[in-house]
Amino acid sequence: MLGRSGYRALPLGDFDRFQQSSFGFLGSQKGCLSPEPGSVGPGADAPESWPSCLCHGLVSVLGFLLLLLTFPISGWFALKIVPTYERMIVFRLGRIRNPQGPGMVLLLPFIDSFQRVDLRTRAFNVPPCKLASKDGAVLSVGADVQFRIWDPVLSVMAVKDLNTATRMTAHNAMTKALLRRPLQEIQMEKLKIGDQLLLEINDVTRAWGLEVDRVELAVEAVLQPPQDSLTVPSLDSTLQQLALHLLGGSMNSAVGRVPSPGPDTLEMINEVEPPASLAGAGAEPSPKQPVAEGLLTALQPFLSEALVSQVGACYQFNVILPSGTQSIYFLDLTTGQGRVGHGEPDGIPDVVVEMAEADLQALLSKELRPLGAYMSGRLKVKGDLAVVMKLEAVLKALK
C-alpha cells in the first residue's frame, strides 16, 4: 500500500534526526496545523488552529521587518554564536523550536527567547550521608556521578531544575541499594554496586534527556560497626597484635568466644615491656594502660625523615578516654625522624585535634579517614584543616 501511494515509511531510528531538520525563520517546514518539531511528548503543544497560525506568521514577519530596519544595531543583539559543545533552545511566541547550532543563530527581537544547553560531560557529587546497612552498621557514604545531556529539548522541557532532580534521584537510588546490603559487601563490591546504580538512575533520567555515564561510591567512614561483628578481626594486621598485647584479657572478654592466641603470641606478650612513658606510673597491669597511648607509641617505628619532609607539621591530640578524662599526646613531624609521645609538644602545635579514644583507634586502624571523621563530627580541629588532611600520609606509612 505504501509502495503504490508513493510514500515510504520513515525508520524509527531516524525519527530524532527528522525532528531536528532545518527551519525557516517563520517556523516549521511542516505546516501551521502540525505540531512544532521537538514538541513530541507528554508536554507537547496541540496543533495550532488557522487563526493562531495566521497571527503567528504575521507577528513573525513584523519581527523580521523590524530586524531588517534596525539591522546595523539590532544585529549585535539578534545574532548569537553557538559553540560546538552547546545547543540553543529557542522559544518563538512561547512555542519551542528545534535545537539551533552549532554556528550562528538569528533571533527575532521581542519574539524569541532562548536557553543554552551544554552537551559536555559534567559531574556532581552526592553529599555524604549516614546510612544503615542490612547488618546494622552505620556508615557515611557519598557518590560521584558523571553525566551528559543527549536530548537538549527534553532537558529543558521535562524538568525545571535538572541538576537538583538528578542529584535527588542518585541519592534515593543509592539509599535503596545500600539498605539491602551488608557492610562487607558494600566495601568489597563498590564497583558492582556503582554499575547497578548507573542502570537504575538512567531508567529515570533518560526521560529527561540526560544520560549518566559513571557512578562511583565513596565510603567516607564506618560510624558504627555491624552488630554481629567482632572487634579484633576488623583491625589492621599491624594494629591487631598491638591491641592484643595492650588489652590482654579484657580484649578477649570483649569479643566473647574468640579463640585464645597461640603459643607464639603468648610468648611475645610476656616479653613486651611497658611503654617508657608509663614507667613512672607504677606496676599497673597492661590491660589498664590507655589504648590511645599504646597506639600512638606504636607509630614511632613507622616515622622517618621522608615522612617528616612530606608532612612537616606538629600535632597535638586531645584524646577523651572512656572515663571522661582527657589525655594529651603529640606527634612532631617537623625535625629529624619525628617524635610521638605523651604530653604537650615542646613548641606551639600547628593544629590541635580532639577526638575520642575509640575514634583514634578506628583512625589508626584505617577504618576511619580524617576527612570522614571531620565531616561526621567525630574529629574536632583547632587550626588549619589542610594540615589535618596530611595525616593521610601517616596512615599510608602504617603497613
Curated annotation (Swiss-Prot):
Modification type Phosphoserine: residues: S28
Motif interval(s): Tyrosine-type lysosomal sorting signal: 6-10
Membrane topology recorded in Swiss-Prot or TrEMBL: Single-pass type III membrane protein
Subcellular locations according to the entry: Membrane; Cytoplasmic vesicle; Cell membrane; Late endosome membrane
GO cellular component: cytoplasmic vesicle; late endosome membrane; membrane raft; plasma membrane
Tissue expression profile of the protein: Expressed in dorsal root ganglion neurons.
Function: May play a role in cholesterol transfer to late endosomes. May play a role in modulating membrane acid-sensing ion channels. Can specifically inhibit proton-gated current of ASIC1 isoform 1. Can increase inactivation speed of ASIC3. May be involved in regulation of proton sensing in dorsal root ganglions.
Record's subunit section: Interacts with STOM; may redistribute STOM from the plasma membrane to late endosomes.
Name of the protein described by the UniProt record: Stomatin-like protein 1
Source organism (scientific name): Mus musculus
Record gene name: Stoml1
